[in-house]
Curated annotation (Swiss-Prot):
Modified residues (Phosphoserine): S225, S327
Keywords: Cell cycle, Cell division, Coiled coil, Cytoplasm, Cytoskeleton, GTP-binding, Methylation, Nucleotide-binding, Phosphoprotein
Name of the gene this protein is made from: SEPTIN5
GO BP, sorted A to Z: adult behavior; cytoskeleton-dependent cytokinesis; protein localization; regulation of exocytosis; social behavior
GO molecular function, one term: GTP binding
Residue ranges of the region described as G3 motif: 108-111
Lineage of producing organism: Eukaryota, Metazoa, Chordata, Craniata, Vertebrata
Designated name of the protein: Septin-5
Highest taxon in the source lineage: Eukaryota
Post-translational modification: Phosphorylated by DYRK1A.
Residues modified as Omega-N-methylarginine: R168
Length: 369
């Protein structure tokens, strides 16, 4: 049905602009505000590297972040490595790129998998991860929560030997011990030792064994439906490439008139950043450029929340048991607290109430499932 109305285009007048300004509230600038605040505060990321000695862990970390964290490292002999116990070493460095600051912490695990008897050799590593969760839980439950330092492990790169025929028992034991505590990204180390066909077969074998043993490695998030096709294609290639076959090198060589990082062999040159040679670029893009924030989110929302819920459940059970017990010691009157102490007590009571409510909700959700 025609209304008989005709619309004419006209230039925007100052009055029109004033009307638009009146309708504009301003919350559309919130992303910019968050961006400025985040950049000013800086970011932190904790990466654990694990695997037996000689698989190129230190070299790969140097290649990923272009930072030498192992300047004072002492190389041990074979006998010393066999007798060495598993250690936990932290290396922290502040990196800045285009005004964005990143506090990078590398957690190394020298001695892992090098002993003759490797049973339970992952115990010091699981204890370390739990200690970081415990420290964060204590800081989060304290009164001063403004400057909590996050030392939780956000990602673990686990190096698998290319010389085996899949996962060894120590590989299965390590990943099953940590897969509920940290995001595990399995890597095939020293991929230049294998031809492309061997790499494909080894990847298929590792994927099958991961499913067979019920190991939960880091799952890449699904793409949004409104993403462009190029991004979706890159995401598909990324998922199909796991576990990543990687090569690391700190040496710059000449290849086709260009200086590239790689390794020089009698039969040719292996380029670290050539996607036809290895998956290093895919790993770097995933770890730094596209999925670093998701790794931190999964650590906080899944792994840490599981630990936190377990702690709250234990605390609540203990409080319930204590409340049922009659104390044989007479309760003495407490001195009258001052205003500041009363405020702190109210804050702690309120926090405990919220924790109990959250626990009740979680129990209800578990019953509904």
């Amino acid at each position: 049905m025609s209304t008989g109305l005709r619309y004419k285009s006209k230039l925007a007048t100052p009055e029109d602009k004033q009307d638009v300004d009146k309708q504009y509230v301003g919350f559309a600038t919130l992303p910019n505000q968050v961006h400025r605040k985040s950049v000013k505060k800086g970011f932190d990321f904790t990466l654990m590297v694990a695997g037996e000695s000689g698989l190129g862990k230190s070299t790969l970390v140097h290649s990923l972040f272009l930072t030498d964290l192992y300047k004072e490292r002492k190389l041990l002999s074979a006998e010393e490595r066999i007798s060495q116990t598993v250690e936990i070493l932290k290396h922290t460095v502040d990196i800045e790129e285009k005004g964005v600051k990143l506090k990078l912490t590398i957690v190394d695990t020298p001695g892992f998998g090098d002993a003759v008897n490797n049973s339970e050799c992952w115990k010091p590593i699981t204890d370390y991860v739990d200690q970081q969760f415990e420290q964060y839980f204590r800081d989060e439950s304290g009164l001063n929560r403004k400057n909590i330092q996050d030392n939780r492990v956000h990602c673990c790169l686990y190096f698998i030997s290319p010389f085996g025929h899949g996962l060894r028992p120590v590989d299965v034991g390590f990943m099953k011990a940590l897969h509920e505590k940290v995001n595990i990204v399995p890597l095939i180390a020293k991929a230049d030792c294998l031809v492309p066909g061997e790499i494909r077969k080894l990847k298929e074998r590792i994927r099958e064994e991961i499913d067979k043993f019920g190991i939960h490695v880091y799952q890449f998030p699904e793409c949004d439906s409104d993403e462009d096709e190029d991004f979706k294609q890159q995401d598909r290639e990324l998922k199909e490439s796991a576990p990543f076959a990687v090569i690391g090198s700190n040496t710059v060589v000449e290849a086709k008139g260009q200086r590239v990082r790689g390794r020089l062999y009698p039969w040719g040159i292996v380029e670290v950043e050539n996607q036809a040679h290895c998956d290093f670029v895919k790993l770097r893009n995933m770890l730094i450029r596209t999925h670093m924030h998701d790794l931190k989110d999964v650590t906080c929302d899944v792994h840490y929340e599981n630990y936190r819920a377990h702690c709250i459940q234990q605390m609540t059970s203990k409080l319930t048991q204590d409340s049922r017990m009659e104390s044989p010691i007479p309760i003495l009157p407490l001195p009258t607290p001052d205003a500041e102490t009363e405020k702190l007590i109210r804050m702690k009571d309120e926090e405990l109430r919220r924790m109990q409510e959250m626990l009740q909700k979680m129990k209800q959700q578990m019953q509904d499932q």
